[in-house]
Amino acid sequence: MAPSPSPIPLAQRLRAGDPRAVARAISLMEEGGSAAAALHAAILPATGRALTIGFTGPPGAGKSTLVDAFVAELRKSGRTVGVVAVDPSSPLSGGAVLGDRIRMGRHTDDPGVFIRSIASRGHLGGLSRSIHHVVDVLDAAGRDAIVIETVGAGQSEVEIVDVAAVRIVVNAPGLGDDVQAIKAGILEIASILVVNKADLPLAPRTVRQLKAMLSLRREGEADVPVLETIASEDRGVAELLAAVDACATLRPEDAAARRRTRIRRLVAEGAAGEMRRRILAWDDAAFLETLARAARGEIDIDTAARAAMEAQAGGVPLPVAVPQKADRRAG
Amino acid sequence: MIHAGTRPLRVLVTKIGLDGHDRGSRIVAAYLRDAGMEVIYTPPWQTIPGVVKLATEEDVDVIGISSLATDHLIVPKMMEALRAAGLGHVGVVVGGIVPEAEQSALAAAGVSRVFGPGAAREEIVECVTALGQKSRAERVDDYSEANP
Ligand code: B12
Ligand SMILES: Nc1nc2c(ncn2[C@@H]2O[C@H](COP(=O)(O)OP(=O)(O)OP(=O)(O)O)[C@@H](O)[C@H]2O)c(=O)[nH]1
Ligand SMILES: [Mg+2]
């Protein structure tokens, strides 16, 4: 393994809950690289205890305001909280103004609430590339509940399924054509649907539309409650927490499965990234010829891609080879 | 594993005390974003412990305080609180309307630079970039540091 500073002291300090260590560890995870990987490995055994709750929904629906009120409710129930608020990075400059936190002002004096703003850094899907690692840091630091706010919903936001045990899709009346704002994919990932800004006159219509959409779901799918909130007045938030807790106790076996899917996805992403870097930097003559043939249309892109990948991978067996499979490959 | 790469500089742009003039801080936040930095922007009226908590959790490299109509000498008190919280490596700049007599007090407290009305975008970006890089270089690497 490459010589890198030992992450162990940092792992110990963050597991003791030291906020500076937690903050530093999150930065390290965002940076990536071998120190991040070593730290992640060191804290992984201490994860899996926190309740993870995701808030997603169209821009301006009131996600941050609702998170602020929801966190207050979690605190009332005696739980410590970590919040990860993801905002988009500018595609032009790569910079960002991370503004979700503006609406989470009431927790500035409470050490029981740790808030971290994360920029999406070009990652699609409403989250950031390092989101799993960031959540693991807060989990290992002993936070009882971890609340994740995603970038306003697009269509590709199903990633939240891997990250959050309970997914809350926040809607609000009057955001254009209401139901159009909630894409089908988003509905399928929801554990709970919220119509926020229930003080607005069109709210009952939005509730009706959502319930109508839910009635079209396949049979056997879990019930999805539709709740109304007025986040700016803390109304409906206690009911929301009750629904979240009910949802979490209903399906405890999900956690292990989600974790496996999550690890699988991380491995797939890591492998894809590594392969991409290798192929982009590859100037082997035979490979250049393959590219030329693809450019001339003699072979299709998929074939060229598969050939490149297999040549790069070199048929090296996995380090922890299952004996039978290794035998079969050798013979 | 995640791809190792460079992380944009992270800057907290905020205002402490009763001063509500926020036009300058909004403009500066946009300047820094457009220069590729991640800006944690807060509304006015923050407290010193609040700023320390924010800077800790967000792991910022630089703090920019906009100060137009406060007791500017609140800034040295903030500097002291930052050092006490182990954030001595974080660079601090101030902008706004600060009388000259007070500017020297801020400098003595460790503020790197005070910008006045009409400060140019390039100057601000250049200063914050340099300060952020210095802050990263000087930070004791917490992950190899012994338990305090
Ligand atoms: C607009 C204004 C207001 C508006 C504010 C609107 C708003 N939301 O911001 C209103 C009308 C509300 C207002 C109210 C008051 N104001 Co007034 N206001 C001004 C005025 C005319 C312009 C300020 C401004 O917006 N400039 C435009 C911005 C873009 O410039 P800037 O803030 O200076 O920012 C630049 C630089 O300073 C620097 N910068 C600023 N912040 C930062 C931060 C960082 C990190 C960096 C790197 C750089 C940086 O970069 C910016 C771009 O160049 C100034 C006079 C003046 N000429 O500056 C008085 C002034 C600031 N106000 C003043 C006063 C006294 C008040 C009141 C107390 C008046 C009263 N008695 O009620 C109230 C207080 C309100 C409050 N709660 O804070 C005094 C302050 C005196 C002092 N320094 O001791 C001033 C200087 C007027 C004067 N000459 O007396 N005000
Ligand atoms: N009337 C009303 N307004 C609300 C309510 N909740 C939030 N708002 C307002 O809606 C606006 C958007 O709120 P945010 O919490 O920033 O919404 P968001 O979904 O986090 O927005 P993005 O992060 O930008 O996608 C703010 O002006 C809030 O004050 C509510 O229950 N009723
Ligand atoms: Mg938000």
Curated annotation (Swiss-Prot), chain B:
SUPFAM superfamilies named among the record's database cross-references: Cobalamin (vitamin B12)-binding domain
Name of a matching Pfam family: B12-binding
Keywords in alphabetical order: Cobalamin, Cobalt, Isomerase, Metal-binding, Plasmid
Catalytic activity: 3-methylbutanoyl-CoA = 2,2-dimethylpropanoyl-CoA
Any one biological process term the GO annotation gives: acyl-CoA metabolic process
PROSITE patterns referenced in this protein's UniProt entry, alphabetically: B12_BINDING
Keyword Lyase: no
Domain B12-binding: start-end pairs: 8-138
InterPro entries: Acid_CoA_mut_C, Cobalamin-bd, Cobalamin-bd_sf
Listed EC numbers: 5.4.99.-
Molecular function via GO: cobalamin binding; metal ion binding; pivalyl-CoA mutase activity
Biotechnology: This enzyme and the derivative PCM-F, a variant in which the alpha and beta subunits are fused into a single polypeptide via a short 11-amino acid linker, have potential applications in bioremediation of pivalic acid found in sludge, in stereospecific synthesis of C5 carboxylic acids and alcohols, and in the production of potential commodity and specialty chemicals.
TM ranges: none
Binding site for adenosylcob(III)alamin: H21
Cofactor: adenosylcob(III)alamin
Homology family: Belongs to the acyl-CoA mutase small subunit family.
Subunit text: Monomer in the absence of the PCM large subunit. Weakly interacts with the PCM large subunit; an alpha(2)beta(2) stoichiometry seems to represent the active state of the enzyme.
Function: Together with Xaut_5043, catalyzes the reversible isomerization between pivalyl-CoA and isovaleryl-CoA, using radical chemistry. Does not exhibit isobutyryl-CoA mutase (ICM) activity.
UniProt protein name: Pivalyl-CoA mutase small subunit
Originating species: Xanthobacter autotrophicus (strain ATCC BAA-1158 / Py2)
